[in-house]
Amino acid sequence: DGTSYKSSFFNFSSMSGIDYLKEILNNKAYWSVWSKFHKRELLLNDPMEIYPNICFGEDVIWSVQLLLRSKKVVSIEYVILDYNIRNLSLSHSCNFDEGKFANFEFYRSWLELYLAQKGVIDFMKKDLAFFHIRNTFQKIVWRKIRNLKKDMDRIIQDLRCFPELKQSMSKRELRVVSAFRFSMLWGNLRLKYYIQKG
């Protein structure tokens, strides 16, 4: 709509690639491959897993692989680009069709499988729990309510392990989770009420 605003600023000097990935999972840094400079050898030394049919979430797949190969990520102190978000952009929520949702579900499952294969998933359980909570409620915003029992069961379990994550959730989100903890039926009724309420 032509409105300009500054993105959130993530202030750091340097950190490991895996630590930067954890910051992304915690919504403090960005997935976008194009907003970073990458050493050429990160792409050339080992083959990358590439999924040419993915049009939504390809940054996740590339960033995870590049960051796990990166010994160090360094920040620069000045703005290097402007990002224009258009109404017809691929990631705009009003254009979120079934194909993009399939991509969304794919990269979520790919991410955890890849981290497990690389032997680093145990270092990132809390970060992945936060990522899963945010993605589950994003699905609800998009009205793509599938596999909800599985998603809510995982959130309930994750909140037992990491109760501090409740601080990142809204009162409404906590009420929804509490309703699902009581029963699937009550959870669905509560969720339907909030969706209708807007």
Predicted regions and their residues:
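Catalytic core of nucleotide-sugar-dependent glycosyltransferases
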Residues: 78-87, 93-120, 139-142, 146-163
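Membrane-interface aromatic/basic loop that binds lipid-linked glycans or pyrophosphate carriers
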Residues: 142-198
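Structural signature of alpha-solenoid helical repeat junctions
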Residues: 120, 124-128
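Residues that form generic nucleotide/phosphate-binding pockets
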Residues: 23-24, 114, 158, 192
